[in-house]
Amino acid sequence: MECCRFGLVSVPVQLFTAVERHTIRFHQVQRGTGDRVRQKRVNERTGQEVPFEEVVKGYPTEDGWVIVDPKELEDIAPGRSRTLEIVGFVDLDEIAPVYFRDTYYLAPSGPQYTKVYGLLREALATANRAGIATFVMRNRQYLAALKAEHEVLAVYLLHWADEVRDPHRELGASLPDHSGASEQELRMAVQLIEAMAIDWDPADYHDTYQQQVQALIDAKRAGGTLEPGIPPPRETEAVDLMQALRASVEHARAGRSGDRDTH
């Protein structure tokens, strides 16, 4: 990306990844030998390996393949492909969470551009709005929301409208018109929600599965093993619903009382 443009104002920027994935990566090896297994690009008809530079893109049709060269895709990329073009400003709350994808940070390309960068950041924060923009990255066009976030400009990639599935069409008859719960059950469920209300702090949450995977690797490396995890809870039967809700509320309130006693 070369610049961010809003109206007649533009600022040269750089794009940085905002999230670091911590997924433990495994390699494919052969059972018994431990030999590394690698994948190759192979001609399906001849069985011969194909050099990377000879690989192009093909779109399947009834008559065969429509062959498209990477250079042809570059030639038809939208204009200003390296520009984050802001087309309007919206309240971020208007965008449903299902539309959000990855997050990036924007930084000015040099110290001479910090004033314009800072102006856009402060203007977005003051107006409490997000800029809706489009840009092209890696031969693909993206829709994005630009927002002032923690003294930087954050770019939230968004799904296009036709990428988001209609839940009523996808889930169909499995969606109930109403829960069928009694007023007493509803009140108890609301009480449970209120009893479990907390302040959001992302540092309180950790990927315990990845921690368990690492513990398994460490245990096997030392010649040991790891105990299985806790089994999933059983499903709540409809006849037990009120009892389960009441017990949950009491448990949540007891936990709150214990937290207060320790502070």
UniProtKB/Swiss-Prot annotation:
Entry keyword annotation includes Repeat? no
Instruction: Kindly list the GO molecular function terms attached to this UniProt entry.
Output: double-stranded DNA binding
Instruction: Enumerate the InterPro entries for this protein.
Output: Ku70/Ku80_beta-barrel_dom, Prok_Ku, SPOC-like_C_dom_sf
Keywords, A to Z, come to: DNA damage, DNA recombination, DNA repair, DNA-binding
One of this protein's GO BP terms? Answer: DNA recombination
* Ku domain location: 6-169
The record's Gene3D superfamilies line, in alphabetical order, gives:
2.40.290.10
Question: In its keyword annotation, does this UniProt entry include DNA repair?
Answer: yes
The residue range of the signal peptide is none
Q: Which Pfam families match?
A: Ku (PF02735)
Entry's family note: Belongs to the prokaryotic Ku family.
Share what the entry says about its subunit structure, partners included: Homodimer. Interacts with LigD.
Q: What does this protein do?
A: With LigD forms a non-homologous end joining (NHEJ) DNA repair enzyme, which repairs dsDNA breaks with reduced fidelity. Binds linear dsDNA with 5'- and 3'- overhangs but not closed circular dsDNA nor ssDNA. Recruits and stimulates the ligase activity of LigD.
Name under which the protein is recorded: Non-homologous end joining protein Ku 3
Provenance organism: Saccharopolyspora erythraea (strain ATCC 11635 / DSM 40517 / JCM 4748 / NBRC 13426 / NCIMB 8594 / NRRL 2338)
